Regions:
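N-terminal signal peptide c-region/cleavage motif recognized by signal peptidases
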Residues: 18-22
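N-terminal alpha-helical modules
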Residues: 24-173
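Bacterial N-terminal signal peptides that target proteins for export
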Residues: 1-11
């Protein structure tokens, strides 16, 4: 029986993390299953959600129950969503790195190391992501939503990196 990388990654993500995460002492309700289930059903058919539409799904539901004007709780919801995508992205990175180590071990002498190139690319991406999201935060300077914009940016960029890493795995890296 064969499974796609997306299926394996989704199953891994669904089993590694708890279904409902109490994020902090403040009482918020963050259910990561909303994002994970959306993602596992994404891009299957034209009627299914797109991968990008799954970004923030759990945070939105969390904020809807926290109260729109409660900035501190909303930030906790957004932070929990970022943490979820960061964990999924890290898992995909390490899976890809392991696959590339195998490829490197079978490569001809003089061929650039795919693992080293992946590491260099990932460091550059982290720098770009952090700079881009700091820029987004500074656009709002001292407003109550400044930190929320930064976290939302980090989440979006990290989720997109997860998609990239997963696509590389699916291409047979």
């Amino acid at each position: 029986m064969t499974y796609s990388i997306r299926t394996l990654t989704a199953v891994m993500a669904l089993t590694l993390l708890p279904v409902s995460t109490p994020v902090a002492a403040q009482d918020i309700s963050f259910n990561e299953r909303l994002t994970k289930e959306c993602y596992s059903q994404s891009d299957i058919s034209e009627a299914s959600p797109t991968r990008a539409s799954c970004i923030g799904r759990s945070a939105k539901a969390c904020m809807d129950t926290s109260g729109a004007e409660d900035h501190a709780r909303n930030e906790l919801c957004l932070q929990a969503e970022y943490d979820l995508w960061d964990q999924m992205s890290s898992g995909a990175y390490f899976m890809l790195e392991a696959r590339l180590e195998e490829i490197d071990s079978n490569s001809h002498e003089g061929t650039p190391s795919q693992v080293i190139l992946l590491e260099n690319m990932h460091r550059a991406w982290i720098n770009l992501r952090n700079t881009r999201c700091t820029f987004m935060q500074t656009r709002w300077r001292t407003g109550p939503d400044a930190r929320s914009y930064e976290i939302a940016c980090l989440t979006r960029e990290t989720a997109n990196q997860f998609f990239f890493l997963e696509d590389e795995m699916a291409r047979g890296a």
